[in-house]
Amino acid sequence: MNPDLQKERAGASFNPELLTNVLDGSPENTRRRREIENLILNDPDFQHENLNFLSRSQRYEVAVKKSAIMVQKMRKFGIADPAEIMWFKKLHLVNFVEPVGLNYSMFIPTLLNQGTTAQQEKWLHSSKGLEIIGTYAQTEMGHGTHLRGLETTATYDPETQEFILNSPTVTSIKWWPGGLGKTSNHAIVLAQLFTQGKCYGLHAFIVPIRELGTHKPLPGITVGDIGPKFGYDEMDNGYLKMDNYRIPRENMLMKHAQVKPDGTYVKPLNNKLTYGTMVFIRSFLVGESARSLSKACTIAVRYSAVRHQSEINPGEPEPQILDYQTQQYKLFPLLATAYAFQFVGAYMKETYLRINEDIGHGDLSELPELHALTAGLKAFTSWTTNTAIEACRMACGGHGYSHCSGLPNIYVTFTPTCTFEGENTVMMLQTARFLMKSYDQVHSGKLVCGMVSYLNDLPSQRIQPQQVAVWPTMVDINSPDSLTEAYKLRAARLVEIAAKNLQTEVIHRKSKEVAWNLTSIDLVRASEAHCHYVVVKLFTEKVLQIQEKSIQAVLRRLCLLYSLYGISQNAGDFLQGSIMTESQITQVNGRIKELLTAIRPDAVALVDAFDFQDVTLGSVLGRYDGNVYENLFEWAKKSPLNKTEVHESYKHLKSLQSKL
């Protein structure tokens, strides 16, 4: 064990195990998660060579092999709970993506949300055991987030009671679905439904694409892999072209909308119900942001405690780089953000499950806010995490650039989150639509509830300098509750600015669509401010729920740092709205420095509490034992280029040196 890490752990103010229990939800959840992790980590069937040293084709084959073993093991161990399945799936390939991932994250949830009981009975069991391997084919070459622009058609033929699927243009070819290229034999295809001469918009269809037994593409289906990408080497993201391809009427998912045998269309109770899978996956992605950022912080903080460099006091030993204030300023706000997102992710999961249950009972009242919240928080957390992972990599200096650090892989695996399941700017604009509707409701005399209830105060308060001039004296920069109020005022102010600018443009332009585009920068800023407020509010509420004093104390420091750092980075908003004064912003910056010093002794313990095992972390720099340099050398020696002392390519250089 590295003596620096021993010293760090001995000097912590709290027991990391207690904080791990908080993150997992309970001590029992921690015990069970570790039990499942150990089933994999101690199983020789799941051991494999370092994927960094394999070709893309080899990496894909390893991933498929491990996925097949995973299903067999889940049956053997009786793992059926959705949360436990998720834990098991995350570990069997460690830090790499799995080709069958969309079968579990998109295909099965869509079947559950949009399929009838009969359809679930037909396909669900087979898909859980990978007899049917499904993917989710929504995105096309020409359209992604703009769902109404999708061009794939499904035309109903009442004579044969079949749908005829077509990819009428090059841009209508399905493009990007994970597992589509080589792995899947079925796809849930999103297509424009035509029946009785009319288009009824996007609907979901179960489409067999490969023959069971031979795995060959079926007649009328053209399918393949789209080629190498920035990351995701193990994933066969694919394309799908359909030419007059027929499927039975029963293959349309009909829990909500239906097409009768004669072609009569029965519309759903609520059009938003068909977007259930997207809402589910976006709520899940908030937790993924937290997990990826927590990994990056663990690596960067541990390495910063092990690495010694330069000098603070001349003649003294080189200090740990974690002792430099600039390193703390790079990493500790990100560590605080990781904890904030952990709690927001747990909240989103609980909220989705609760509202989904209400929807099942016919109560759709909270669906609009759930849609807006999942869209906005998906964008807010993934944008932040994407930038933060790269900041962690650069905080590790040159070694962070090596794949041995684990950070490049975390980055390239996470960064697609900013564009898949809804491009982030568009997601923010979807949240903005909900905010504008809520603003209009308030101004028509109605009250709004949920996370936007702060807008109810607008008509009486008006976010204007002369009427909130007393506010600065009320801000307590040491009170998470007071800071939450400051974020609330900022959100209200930016929502009102966006709404007023939108109204002005509507009057001038006469077109709501053009006005929306010309106000879109303000609308995105309003959504970001709303999401930032939600994160601060949820973090603050979580801290108050903690009973153990040592845990509450360290989380309170992180909560304060997260809130104050956000104010520092967005000082203009707080100053322009007269929410805070210039002297208070100066105090905020001073308090941030104090918090860096206060968090420093607990930094290693805080990342230990995330409880990532070394195999899960996949990093030489972030090893639990801190023995970085010895293992860095061992890792390098495994490079395939080192299998020979003289590489075969030397023949090209030898002729140039023959005259020397």
From Swiss-Prot:
The gene from which this protein is expressed is: ACOX1
For this protein's source organism, the top of the classification is: Eukaryota, Metazoa, Chordata, Craniata, Vertebrata
| Keyword Transmembrane helix included in the entry's annotation | no
Q: Name one Pfam family in it.
A: Acyl-CoA_ox_N
Which residues are marked as site: Cleavage? Answer: V468, A469
What's the protein name? Peroxisomal acyl-coenzyme A oxidase 1
Top enzyme class? oxidoreductase
N6-succinyllysine modification, residue list = K89, K90, K241, K349, K437, K446, K512, K542, K637, K643, K654
Q: Which organism is it from?
A: Bos taurus
Q: What does this protein do?
A: Involved in the initial and rate-limiting step of peroxisomal beta-oxidation of straight-chain saturated and unsaturated very-long-chain fatty acids. Catalyzes the desaturation of fatty acyl-CoAs such as palmitoyl-CoA (hexadecanoyl-CoA) to 2-trans-enoyl-CoAs ((2E)-enoyl-CoAs) such as (2E)-hexadecenoyl-CoA, and donates electrons directly to molecular oxygen (O(2)), thereby producing hydrogen peroxide (H(2)O(2)).
A GO CC annotation recorded here is:
peroxisome
Its pathway, per UniProt, is: Lipid metabolism; peroxisomal fatty acid beta-oxidation
Q: Which residues form the active site?
A: E421
Q: Fetch the PANTHER family from UniProt.
A: ELECTRON TRANSPORT OXIDOREDUCTASE, PEROXISOMAL ACYL-COENZYME A OXIDASE 1
Q: Where is this motif: Microbody targeting signal?
A: 658-660
Superkingdom, taxonomy of origin: Eukaryota
